[in-house]
Amino acid sequence: MLDIKKISTLSDLSELKTAYFAESTAPLDGMWHFGFVPMSDHFGFYENGNLVGYCVLNGEGYLLQFYLAPTASTHIENLFPLIVENNSSVIGEVKGAFVSMAEPQYLSLCVDNTESFKVNAMMYRQNSQARSDCDSDRIEEIEMSLATEEQLEQFVEFASSAIGAPKEWLTGYYSNLIARQELWGYIENNHVLATGECRKFDEHQTQFADLGMIVAQQERGKGLATRVLNFLKQHANSQGLEAMCSTESSNIGAQKAITRAGLSSKHRILQFDFSELKETD
């Protein structure tokens, strides 16, 4: 008999999360798994009182993670359809799922249950030969400086204007990056023209650095994004870390900049829709 309960103490899932990341075939997106997942609802799967698995559901009804330990008596192929068919009163309505191609079991479960999906984002990681900086020699260097607490408001205003993100969320997000010395700025005449993020992982995937950048609207198309990413990649490499990042599938400009900076994409993040599930016998 399997019971499903909501989990409020995420540290209870530490061992299961470690196993989940160990099964991935490539580093998982930092913003999704360390930004969005902690803000979402977690549900534990219990057999005879023992925690044997979990899933994560965001506020919009989309699964972000799904895991069942191989030691569990329950078959994951039976549990997943039960949940996505909205048969769990604890979890409630599940509209769909976000899953990357680097999560083979979770991806297979989604594909088995619906044919309705679209590409949401492209996942990139540093080309192996890029460590020698063979590409970097052809990219104009850029002077970037670490953001300070005094610059927080200026950076928040810039990002809010450039990408339309909520200021309240940006304030908390950037404040944390500044404290960790992971937020950089490219500033001319006291105006922020670009920001760069080089985020380290506290647990799981600690050999990688997750990059992010924003370029001012009026500065786009001039090669600035490539220079920022190249700076961040070199900074990551100087600390013995491999660079990775992601971008929306519709952002062609960012994809070109990322490729020029020496990163390539083999995996995608897919968005599945469970409103049309496959017929099951």
Model-derived regions, located:
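Conserved acetyl-CoA-binding loop-helix of GNAT-fold acetyltransferases
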Residues: S73-N86, V215, G221-A236, Q255-R260
